[in-house]
């Protein structure tokens, strides 16, 4: 296929949608495409220079006539400006709201054909989709796009059920950069964090929102720590962090739980971990599961949303019901005490990563969509 000029608009902050949008752009740039990020700030994963990657900042001014800064209008104007000046072939919007709507407005301003691809990541459907004042706008955003993808079949199904669009929604899974997420030498990393060689390490990585149920993770770890020597790594930050700290103090686990905040090299922490817990009550995919699996960490997740598409129960990990701390504890101890089971899960997970979630496969799927939409030279 010919090399394309692709505009990407996304949330630049820490979070699955921003990570995938940025990593996709980086991989596309490596394949020779010209990538233009159009965002409010530099995406946090855009940490290396590449001659094919360009950043265009959306600067929002405050005016007395507007009660709130007009980000959406400014973004639409910026997309149109960049698309016109750089002669973009494609605009890829990550999130239906506001990005797909802004891409549509930009297309109307351009008055020329430009392909709009919208990727649904979760919150734009599973949270905003339940707001009656936004549902029709989300449907409009989806149906105004030329192609629409969702990061899991579960999310696509929920979108059809809740929003009821007529547009076809294709499932294209998330992916990770296999060159980054791989198991590393662990002795020095463990020593750096004061973890003894014979201690088991449990890890949880999230944005510490209520839906992540971090308190369940702590309760499961409390049970684990009562049975074996272990440490819990809590990686990330968010509104539930203070509540998590209170629970840790209540259970007297201060010496066994490391609150590490946001980390740039989370792959180092996965490399020293024996078990990954993701016990969310709502999860459209669970990108952190792929990251952990690639680093050789067996995973336990809840049987909701897109997680069962990532973890095959009793094949590449365990699934438990939301809130079932007892079952999660039992499954965790099975993995921590049975090295053969742990190794079996790890091997199966890596095979599934290579077959279903490889960056080569996923990026090629997006490339095919772009090629279908791009005007011939």
Swiss-Prot record:
Effect of disrupting the coding gene: Mutant does not produce bacillithiol.
Key words of the record: Glycosyltransferase, Nucleotide-binding, Transferase
Activity regulation comment: Inhibited by BSH.
One Pfam family from the record: Glycos_transf_1
Catalytic activity: (S)-malate + UDP-N-acetyl-alpha-D-glucosamine = (S)-malyl N-acetyl-alpha-D-glucosaminide + UDP + H(+)
Binding site for UDP: 207, 263, 291
EC number: 2.4.1.-
Function: Involved in bacillithiol (BSH) biosynthesis. Catalyzes the first step of the pathway, the formation of N-acetylglucosaminylmalate (GlcNAc-Mal) from UDP-N-acetylglucosamine (UDP-GlcNAc) and L-malate.
Protein name per Swiss-Prot or TrEMBL: N-acetyl-alpha-D-glucosaminyl L-malate synthase
Organism lineage string: Bacteria, Bacillati, Bacillota, Bacilli, Bacillales
């Amino acid at each position: 296929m010919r090399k394309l000029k692709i505009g990407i608009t996304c949330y630049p902050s820490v979070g699955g949608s921003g990570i995938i949008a940025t990593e996709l752009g980086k991989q596309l740039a490596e394949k020779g495409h010209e990538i233009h990020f159009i965002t409010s700030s530099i995406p946090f994963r855009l940490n290396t220079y590449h001659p094919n990657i360009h950043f265009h900042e959306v600067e929002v001014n405050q005016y007395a006539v507007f009660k709130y800064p007009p980000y959406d209008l400014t973004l639409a104007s910026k997309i149109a400006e960049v698309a016109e000046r750089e002669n973009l072939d494609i605009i890829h919007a990550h999130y239906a709201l506001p990005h797909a709507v802004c891409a549509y407005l930009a297309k109307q301003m351009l008055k020329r054909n430009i392909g709009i691809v919208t990727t649904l990541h979760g919150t734009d459907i599973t949270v905003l989709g339940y707001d009656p004042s936004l549902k029709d706008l989300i449907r409009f955003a989806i149906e105004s796009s030329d192609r629409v993808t969702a990061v899991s079949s579960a999310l696509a199904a929920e979108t059809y059920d809740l929003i009821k669009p007529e547009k076809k929604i294709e499932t294209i899974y998330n992916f990770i950069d296999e060159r980054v997420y791989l198991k590393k030498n662990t002795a020095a990393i463990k020593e750096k964090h004061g973890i003894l060689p014979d201690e088991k390490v449990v890890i949880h990585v999230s944005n510490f929102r209520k839906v992540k149920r971090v308190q369940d993770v702590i309760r499961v770890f409390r049970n684990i720590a009562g049975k074996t020597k272990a440490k819990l790594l809590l990686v990330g930050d968010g509104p539930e962090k203070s509540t998590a700290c209170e629970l840790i103090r209540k259970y007297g686990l201060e010496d066994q739980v490391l609150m590490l905040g946001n980390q740039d090299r989370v792959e180092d922490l996965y490399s020293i971990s024996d078990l990954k817990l993701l016990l969310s009550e709502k999860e459209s995919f669970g990108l952190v599961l792929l990251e952990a699996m690639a680093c050789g960490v067996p995973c336990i997740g809840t049987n909701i949303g897109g997680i069962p598409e990532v973890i095959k129960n009793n094949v590449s990990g365990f699934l438990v019901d939301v809130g079932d701390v007892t079952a999660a504890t039992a499954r965790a101890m099975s993995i921590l005490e049975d090295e053969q089971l742990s190794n079996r899960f790890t091997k199966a997970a890596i095979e599934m990563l290579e077959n279903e979630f490889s960056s080569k496969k996923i990026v090629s799927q997006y490339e095919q969509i772009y090629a279908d939409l791009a005007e011939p030279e």
